[in-house]
Amino acid sequence: MALAQKVASRPAVASRRGVVVVRASVESRRAVLGGLLASTVVALTSANKAQAAATPVDLFDDRKVRETGFDLIYEARDLDLRQSARDGLDQARGSIDATIKRVKESETRIDADLEGFIKKNYWTEAREQLRRQVGTLRFDLNTLASAKGVKAEKKKALELKKEFIQKVEDLDFALREKDETSALKKLEAAKSALDSVLAYVL
């Protein structure tokens, strides 16, 4: 009983939490609703402008490109299709005119660029240019050799190509050794080997 009286006689402790009272007036409600309405109107107007500025879908006729096999790598795997066709090697070998054009372009770059790079001692650029051109020349010379009808002519063309590749490997070694005089000599040997193989296959 005494405990109950002590508890009852204690003064009530005021809560430490503050109470926030918000009273919205009619004017503030109207301002909020007016702002909401204005932003909605602006959003709808900009959406209409964007739709008006949109162009129609452009349609392209890619049937010619698809016939050449451009999109084969994006299609599901066709097990009847050879890997060389999927990689584009058959398409590259299909046109002899395009192959001749690539070979002449490679010859021009070898004749024009390599000597300047070697004389300036730009070894990395010389090696990269040589390897870029020979990378396609290997396959293109094989294509031109296989276009020869007679087996003996084909064999002779492949022998000349093999000699050219050997001269290129010697030149590449001289470029890696950074020997200017040796590289210039081997460049001339590689050029003459390329000229002889091209004279035979073209």
Curated annotation (Swiss-Prot):
Predominant location category: plastid
Origin: domain of life: Eukaryota
Localisation: Plastid, Chloroplast thylakoid membrane
GO molecular function annotation: calcium ion binding; electron transporter, transferring electrons within the cyclic electron transport pathway of photosynthesis activity
One of the record's GO cellular component terms: photosystem II oxygen evolving complex
Coiled coil residues, start to end: none
Bilayer-crossing regions: none
A Pfam cross-reference name: PsbQ
Keywords associated with the record: Chloroplast, Membrane, Photosynthesis, Photosystem II, Plastid, Thylakoid, Transit peptide
Record carries keyword Zinc: no
Gene3D superfamilies reported for this sequence: Oxygen-evolving enhancer protein 3 (PsbQ), four-helix up-down bundle (1.20.120.290)
One BP term from GO: photosynthetic electron transport chain
Family: Belongs to the PsbQ family.
Record's protein name: Oxygen-evolving enhancer protein 3, chloroplastic
Species assigned in the record: Volvox carteri (Green alga)
Source species taxonomy: Eukaryota, Viridiplantae, Chlorophyta, core chlorophytes, Chlorophyceae
Gene expressing this chain: PSBQ
